[in-house]
């Protein structure tokens, strides 16, 4: 035990000289056991040790005093192993046996091979001498040593940086505020009302001499704990350290009273900020001292100038009246002012009468005829009554134009000392307490005072504003306001207070007469229609029939969980309590749990009820009529709900509400404001000079593009005359990723994010939705991959043919996207767009292993470096073009009608039987079936040979006399043909509609027959369908093979020729060329003078010439013009 306790010390203090005392024993599978001896056992010989495969213990031959320390490969921690005394074989025998013999499982052959390779690496490794500890050296656990830099053998480490942590000041910022990154200061996200308190302030306390002028200076009033009642040393808040202060350090001081919206003051032992006005969103917080606190810190409050007072008054009045252009501070004041406009309108419109005024009054003395007076006002002196009328007439003007002065924040207010003064007028205006019981006996004897007619002068005064009576004192104004508030309170109590309640049905009334009138409905007196079951009386038969439904067998309220039904909803709510399981209701259909009966009732009605309400416009059905009405709005064009912020219109009110919550919420507006102040870092785009490195290229402008849409936009703007089918990159399929979307709450898997979202909303209500892939931001250094939170997995790619818009140059990967584009960009064609949708372009894939024919006629293996995009996209498009391939050995028959000579008629039609041949570039032996070879990116694009595969055709030709008259202009003529060429239209020619094919004369053909490949002078290869357009060949070269009419050779000619042309991209027309070979020409070495050179570019075409002698032997030559 002592040896084991000292093992860690011996291990850590081992030096270079102690390596002999710590032998390492190598076992199979790369396991290493190291024996650490104690101090007095260092001279012992090596012990025979077997390291167990499970890593829990080891076995020694004898009870030696040593400790075996196991180093965990995962984290490098050390642990001691228990000792088991047992006699074991020698090391050689132990090492020859597999270590994993204790396990029940047997390793496979592949795992044994991997273990052998690991053993070989461990055998080659030799530990270095342990270097002394130096903090400048980097430790390598694999080498068990330190290095001055990265380990040379094992390479550099893979660092994972710490996640950045915000400072205390920024982390403590409330959610309703944000700090501007560029301007500085604290701004609001939403409206903050007046009298909102922030704080307390946190920060270190220092002396005044250590303060900085960049922040507001705040002093803390403190008492000395040792000396009672005496102040301690003055200490100030240091607001310069973000790690020790909270967010209030970022609030900047106000320069004047106009921009100040916070006051700083000390309450207790803390400093707080309080808002002195309503702070609007996106407004900065500016603080200054309160009046008393400013005197404490030897500062002055900001004086309010007359201009600032006007601005403040206009800012506070945010409720304008559209009748008289006045503004008010609150909606209540505006509503009271609008009532005054209503009174004026009623007084002006109604005619005069000698009786009492019938105009609408809010709080007048006029009463409805036959209505008794409830509350009486005691008699007041005449002077007080006149003054009261004056107050009531001018109270509206006072309430909205009152100006307050005072000592608070420098504002001048009227002295409030007069508030405590009690005058006789105040006593007269304050009525004594009145008891309702004492007034009921006097109600009959009291008559209301007469109301005189309002003179015309008074009506004229009501139509316009007039200044306040200067004789009214502030006390009179306050008393008038109290009278009006008391009247409003009385009106509210009168409307809401219902003390008289019916004992039978529980209905409440404000008056006793109403209750007595209601009680007659419960008895037989005064009611002709009486219920024979409960005795309740009704005034009409309709009301009785509605009541009898409650006593019928058809119960209206049935239980969802059993067969019980009730005539009242209250009884049903009491009953459903017995169906609760652990405080929750379980849906009888899907076993979902709900805490409220209303929720489970809505769930059953929405998802498990029968859909009987069918839509007349479509096939959808609903279980409720209100849902059907909402759905019918989809088929209408009316949009009655308008967003007042952005002007967008909606058909449904709930959609408008969702729009307001999603697009115009305060947090989003605050983010927009923050985004406006941000300046995007301008990245200087350096145009690349490697044109071939781009996937999508415009060869007319020699410009490359990274994306397909950029090339389409470029062609539509710069080259509108060019068709998209003429660009080979735009005919290639579109590669889209294919993903699986997993539900993180169950085992469901979906192919689209929208279906997964609908599943979560329906089956997991209230659960959090996974983030959208489109809104993910790249992870920073040390942060986890954001794709892990989306619960998606990439399962492969899908190659789809592009779908072109019939009205513009746009291309889309699916028909649905294209239809959406038409509805948005071409609404005039959305109803007939289905018939004009272009079918996806078909891409032909060629796969073959042909021979390569060189210029000397021999067949050799060619190493062709193909274009990276062409080869990769060709392999990807193989899955799409199976239907367009023609099986090997299939024959197609075409009919060719030649044109006779001048004055001659049409010759007999000739049928040419052509065998389809698949031609592809020869595969490189170094590619190893690899689609992308990095070495091809910088190879020069110079090609001198390509693959040509030759097959046979059979020609059924008529008599020689008819053939002699057949002549076609624009095609290569035979050496014996000396007649003038005649133009042949493309409508009369029937070209072979298969690309990348060459023809060769059959070896058993009639001697003297001549084979031609014709290309008319007006032939344009871009106008043909996509099947015969440019195919994938090296250097974007394309073979155009055509069948020709056999022409009888001359008598002295023993050789015939067949010519094929290879044209490159960008060459719109290819004129026919006459290739003549003298009869004495040597086979295999054609004269260069035979090649046509008239007006042809050197890099636009290749000419393939096949020479056949009289014996049937043929030879092929590839030359450049």
Swiss-Prot record:
Gene3D superfamilies: Classic Zinc Finger, SET domain. Residues 106-124 have a biased composition (Acidic residues). It is found in: Nucleus. Residues 192-295 are annotated as: N-terminal PR domain. The SET domain is degenerated, suggesting that it has lost methyltransferase activity. Transcriptional activator, essential for early embryonic development and survival of embryonic stem cells (ESCs). Supports cell growth and survival during early development by transcriptionally activating the expression of the translation initiation factor EIF3B, to sustain global translation. Activates the transcription of FLNC. This is PR domain zinc finger protein 10. It comes from Danio rerio (Zebrafish). The gene is prdm10.
